[in-house]
Regions:
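Conserved catalytic core of the tyrosine transesterase superfamily
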Residues: 1-256
Length: 256
């Protein structure tokens, strides 16, 4: 049997985690996750599951009609009785709350918007399938986002960063010992990230077989599992080739 890729391994891990999360929700929620499975990634469904956990915990704590029953005992027809006001109270609750570990949790506009968007999808599934008569989530206005300026490194800052990785002048003697062993690898990683703009998670999922030197591109998987090719220049190519050449000379220790 062929070994699994990084993405296949992560997908299996996510499926196991998702099944555990669904068991903690009301039984009817399983239908929702089956319904959206063909159109979503496991990571997206896990995010939905976490968001629903917060919502049902809110109902259990703050709604007098549901306070005497467990989250797993909440019925779909009870959700049908909620109003827009209940959702507005939930949005207020999300700004500042305590989680199950009695830790303070705060949400900004983006976090609140994501959780409400999850509920809109959740309610829409049951409304579209005629299992509830009301869809108050569709009437809730999402919070206005205040866009944050994206901070980028300028050309000089990029050069300084790569020089520091290559030279390691400011490292301690102990750090320099590690630096000598990992410098070429670290330089390849940073040059790839800076030269292509891929996410760290996308870089983590790369295999050597995903690199196409002939066409100057790497195969990555975007959010939702979409496969795309990102192209790179000669500087990235040189850094990758230097590392792969060094890698071929490394003799792994037994058990690695």
């Amino acid at each position: 049997m062929a070994s699994l890729t990084y993405h296949e391994q992560k997908d299996i891990e996510n499926i196991k985690k998702l099944r555990g999360l669904i068991k903690e929700l009301p039984p009817f929620c399983a239908d929702f996750f089956r319904g959206i499975e063909p159109l979503t990634s496991t990571r997206t469904r896990i995010a939905y599951a976490y968001d629903l956990h917060v919502f049902f915990d809110f109902l259990h704590k703050e709604n007098p009609a549901l306070a005497r029953i467990t989250v797993q005992d909440i019925k779909l027809d009870q959700l049908d009785q909620l109003s827009v006001t209940d959702f507005e109270e939930y949005m207020e609750y999300l700004k500042y709350r305590f989680n199950d570990k009695n830790q303070e949790v705060m949400n900004k506009e983006r976090g609140i918007m994501r959780k409400i968007s999850s509920l809109k999808s959740f309610y829409n599934y049951y409304y579209r399938n005629e299992r509830i008569k009301n869809n108050p989530a569709a009437l809730v206005q999402l919070p206005k986002l205040h866009e944050k300026e994206i901070i980028r490194l300028d050309v000089d800052e990029v050069a300084l960063l790569l020089d520091e990785v290559e030279q390691g002048d400011k490292l301690t003697d102990k750090q320099k010992n590690y630096h000598a062993k990992t410098k070429t690898r670290d330089l390849a990683l940073l040059t790839l990230l800076l030269g292509t703009g891929i996410r760290v998670s996308e870089c983590v999922g790369l295999n050597i077989s995903d690199i196409d030197f002939k066409n100057g591109g790497i195969r990555i998987y975007r959010k939702g599992g979409k496969e795309v090719t990102v192209y790179f220049g000669t500087e990235v190519e040189d850094a990758l080739l230097d590392y792969l050449e060094e890698r071929d000379r490394i003799i792994p220790e037994q058990g690695h």
